[in-house]
Amino acid sequence: VRDAHLTTTEVGILVAAYPAGVLLAAIPSMALVDRRGVRMTTVVGIGVLIASTLGFGWGTSPLLLDASRFVQGVGGAVAWAGALAWLTSTTPSARRGSVIGGAVGAALVGMVIGPSIGALASQVGRGPVFSALAIVLVVLLLAGPSSAPAPTPRRGSVQALVKLLRSRRGAMGNGLLLVIGTVGGTMWSLVPLLVAHRMGGAGVIAAILAVSYLLAALWNVFLGRFSDRFGRLLPTLVGLAIAAALLPVIPVLSPLYVLFMVSVAAQSVISSLWTPAAALVSDGAEGSAAGQAVGVATMNAAWAAGGASGPVLAAWLADAAGFPLPFALAGGLCAASAVVVLLAYRRSGEPKAAASTAPAVERR
C-alpha cells in the first residue's frame, strides 16, 4: 500500500482483483477439466500463477498490480478446480468433508507464509521475494503426481451443471460461499487500514493474517470431519452467529491488541465456513471428475462474486461514511444468513453427509 501509494478505494480494488479473476475463470476451468482432465487443468493453472506472480513482484504502477492480481485469480481458479475435482472425484461422498477440509486447511497453512512474505517484501522489495515464490511454484509443478483420472469421452459438464443448479444442497452451499467471499473480502480490505490508523505496522498486519490463516486451517480440518459425521448446517450456523456478533465491534476497538484478537477470531471463523459450504456443493454435484469440476467451478464463482464486490463496496462505504458502516453491514449479512441456515435446519433436520449418497432426484 505504501510502496505504490494506494488510496483506500485503490486498496479495495487491489483486494477485489484476485476474486474477479477467479470469477472470470470459473466456467473455463470447468470446461478445461471436462476436455483435458484434472491433471492438465492443474498444470495450466499453476503455470498462469507463476507468470502472474512475477508480474506482481516487479510491477510498479497500481494498474499493473491490479492486472497481476487479476491474472493470479485466473490461475488460482484453474489450479484449484483441477486439484479439488481430482480429490473429490476419487473420494466417497461420506468422506468428502474431511477431504475438502484437509485441502482447504493445507492451502491456508501455505497462506500463513503469505503475510511473512509481505512483511519481507516491504523490507527487501517485492521483485526478489516474488521471484523466489515463482521458483517454489515451479518446483511444486515438477513434483506433482503423474497419474490422474482420465477425462471423460462424453462432454457432460453442461448436464452436470444443470443437475447441480437444481440441487438444494448445491444452492445452499454456493449461497454461503457468496457470503463468505463478501465478508472475507470486506475484512481483508479494511482491517489493515484500521491497524494502520492505530499506528500498527506491516508486522502487525502480517501477524493478524498469519494467525487467522493458521486457526482457520485447523478449524477447516476439524469441521470437515465434524460435518461428515453430524452434517453441514450445524457448524455453519454456529460460525455465522459468531461472525455476526464480532464484526460490528471491530472498527470501534481502540487498543491495538484487542483489535488484533477480535479480527483474528472473526476472520478465522469466516474462513472456517469454507469447508462445510463447499461440502454441500460437492454433495449436490455428480460424483465424476467432470461433475465435481462443475461443483468446484460454481464454488469459485460464488466465492469470487462476493470477494470481488465486497472489498470495493466496503472501501467505498468506508471512504464515504467511515469504517463502522461496512462492518455493520457485513455483520448483518452473517446474521441474515444464519437465519436462513437455521430455518433450513429446523425444516429438514441436519442433512448428514450420508444423505448425499441418495439418488440425485431425492436430493433436489
For each of these PLM feature ranges, what is it?
Residues 1-8, 189-203:
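Short amphipathic helix-loop junctions that connect adjacent transmembrane helices
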Residues 78-91, 272-286:
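Intracellular juxtamembrane helix-capping segments at the cytosolic ends
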Residues 19-27, 111-112, 213-221, 307-308:
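Residue-level signature of mid-helix packing/kink "hotspots" within the transmembrane helices
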Residues 68-107:
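Cytoplasmic helix-loop-helix junction between adjacent transmembrane helices
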Residues 102-145, 324:
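Helix-loop-helix hairpin linking two adjacent transmembrane segments in secondary transporters
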Residues 147-174, 359-364:
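Juxtamembrane intracellular "pre-TM" segments in multi-pass secondary transporters
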Residues 24-60, 227-233:
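Conserved MFS/SLC helix-loop-helix module at the cytosolic interface between two early adjacent transmembrane helices
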Residues 134-153, 340-345:
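C-terminal membrane-cytosol helix-exit motif in multi-pass small-molecule transporters
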